[in-house]
Amino acid sequence: MTPSEARDQICATGLSLHQRGYVHATAGNLSVRLDDGSFLITPTDACLGTLQPERLAHVGADGVQTSGDRASKTLALHRRIYAADPQARCVLHTHATHLVALTLAGVWQAQDIVPPITPYYVMKVGHVPLAPYRRPGDPATADWVHDTLAASVAAGRPLRAVMLDRLGPVVWHRSPAEASAVLEELEETARLWLLIGRNVAPLSAAQIDELRQAFGAVW
C-alpha cells in the first residue's frame, strides 16, 4: 500500500477499535511497515479514536524519525517484531479489558494464555505466550518478543500475538484489518474463558489436527 493509504488505514483502524471498546483514552498504538522498509506509527499518548493522518510519525528503516508527532514509546517493540517476522506489515497493541483481566486472574499457561477452546481461536490466532511484566516501553520487552517470535518463525510455527503481563496484547499481521481480526478473536476467547470460569476442556489433539488438515491452521 502507498504511504497515503497506510495513513488512512491506520486512522480508520484506530477509530474502529476505539468506537467498539477495544482501546480507551490514550492506551494502545499501531504501526504499518511500508514497502521501502520504513514505517508509520501512532504518536505517543495519542487517542486511537482521534488520529490525524498527517500527525502520524514516520520512522526510517534505521529507526530515526523523519516526520510527524513524537513516536509511540513502544517504537522499539514494533521495530523488533518487524525484524523478526518478514511477513509482518502491521503491529497493533491495545489494553484490551478481558485480556488484561486474564493476566490478573491467572493465565492458562505461560506459553498459551488461553486454551484452544474454539476452532476459530486455533485457526485465526494460534499460540499466545505471556511476556513477563515490565514497565511500558522497557527495551527488555522488545528483546523478549523478538527472540520468542524469531524462535517460532525458525520452528515453522510463527506467532501472531503475544500478551504483555498486566498491559495488553500485541498482535501483527499483513494488514491493519488482519491484525484487528486477530485481536478481536483473541479478546473474545479471553472473554469466553473468563465467563465460563476457566473450567472447560480444550479441543482435543485430534480436533486440532483436523483444523490443520482442513484449513491449514498453524498450531
Where are these regions (language model features)?
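Glycine-rich flexible loops
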Residues: M1-W219
